Amino acid sequence: MQEQKSLKVNSILNILKTISAIVFPLITFPYVSRVLQPENIGKVNFSGTYVGYFSLIASLGIATYAVRECAAVRDDRKNLSSVASEIFSINVCTTALAYILLAVSLVLFRRLDNYRTLIYIQSTTILFATWGADWINSAMEDFKYITIRSILFQCVSLILTFVLIKSPDDYLNYAIISVFSSSGANLSNVFYRRKYCNLRVTINMQVQKHFKPILLLFVMILAQTIFNSADITMLGLFCGDTEVGIYSTAYRIKSIIVQVVSSLAVVMMPRMSYYFAENDWDKINDMLKKVLSVMVTIGFPCIAGGVSLSDDIVRLVGGIEYADASMPLKILMLSFIIDIFGGNFLGNMICLPTKQEKVFMEACCVAAGVNVILNYLLIPVGGASAAAFTSGVAALVIFIWLLLKKDKRVRLDYILDVIKMPMVGAVAIVLFCSAIKVFKFGFWMSLVMKIGGSVVLYGSLQLGVRNPVVWDMLDLILKKIGRKGESR
């Protein structure tokens, strides 16, 4: 019973954290994108992407591995302190290596001189991430602290954004605020983590024990990062900062929706890992069906809305200067259909809980190679839209690879039954939004009618076709309301 309660509480907390991560960018990015203009937004995003490669070297696969290993010994403070210190010390060494390689790259590649200050600023995220060791909180399932801390720092960053960003020349301030928002919270971990363990740097790092699984996870994450970041990097090299700014705007909008769907894996993965360890395949397949049902019930209407409202969303978020981001956004949203079934479902919900990182790694490596080759061929011709298309191809490669390599005991015969109800609702959203366009309403009236009408239409259809996910959510809401009424 306690296990179920913990899962529900963690789910609610993670939803709150995800919503805050969505709401704050929706508030700040329209303002920032208009003030800084596409060129300066492109500079910040390009340098951030570049630093991201070295951040990956520093982190390896340590965070994912550390959560798994520390969670296994979390009831023994002494053992937890020992394991955490070993992993932390390895992380310190990889961080030092990352900074050395970053310094060498700045000397070798003179084209980066224009981005040097931005790179200095954004590279501090590497230090903060290592120093903070936030994986301890995740291993202890302290989602309450993680959620409150994240929202607090986002609130402060929101205020700083409107105070310190007033002109296009303030793009350095934007970079500093972004670092503070994403990594500043790690500073509080230095004191808070003492609640769980005594973390220190040790010479006895047990490298032979830890390094092989860390390296395997690193290769997987590296491949994921390449096909996620190669688009922006190669756009910057072939097409310039403006095209990067346009693509980044579309990609950021898509990322907001991805966060909502992907957040489910954060809470469900421990439960899936438990069932896999118990080899209870009846519960495994039942849980997988429920997880996929939630993913498509939430994801499909978001995708339909993103495609139908792409022009409106881009205008709302970035302004008319970013109008060219509409087509890349449409392509990215359509490719997310593939990603739901591939990386999110087959990868995060099946491969990782079963410790099949090698299969996931192989899929990501092949996809990364395909993505880079296609980017080289298509970006000089098609720009941001070509970059969006290659991302979709990479997602398709991952899906096909994981589907062919999946455990034969994993049943997928329920997929058509699961997707048919959300698919009906998604098609209805597209048709409804297309009909609204015919009447030529003003921008705000049209936007409100499209969003409001789509929500009502989709919800009504899902209730009408008896979608169990929607009915369970409605039942939960009614029970909460009933309890509040009884307490009064």
What is the predicted role of each segment?
Residues M1-E3, L7, K144-T147, Y171-S178, ...:
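Interhelical loop/hinge segments that connect adjacent transmembrane helices in multipass membrane
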Residues Q4, L106-Q122, V307-D339:
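Interfacial segments at transmembrane-helix termini and the short loops linking adjacent helices
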Residues K5-T64, Y99, A103-L106, S157-L158, ...:
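Signature of the first transmembrane helix
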Residues F29-P30, S59-D75, A250, K254-L292, ...:
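Helix-loop junctions and terminal segments of transmembrane helices
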Residues Y31, G42-S59, L216, D231-T233, ...:
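Alpha-helical transmembrane segments of polytopic membrane transporters and translocases
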Residues R116, L127-I148, L334-V366, L377:
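Membrane-interface junctions at transmembrane-helix termini in multi-pass inner-membrane proteins
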Residues R116, Y120-S123, T147-K195, P213, ...:
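Hydrophobic alpha-helical transmembrane segments
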Residues S434-R488:
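Membrane-proximal transmembrane or re-entrant/amphipathic helices at the cytosolic face
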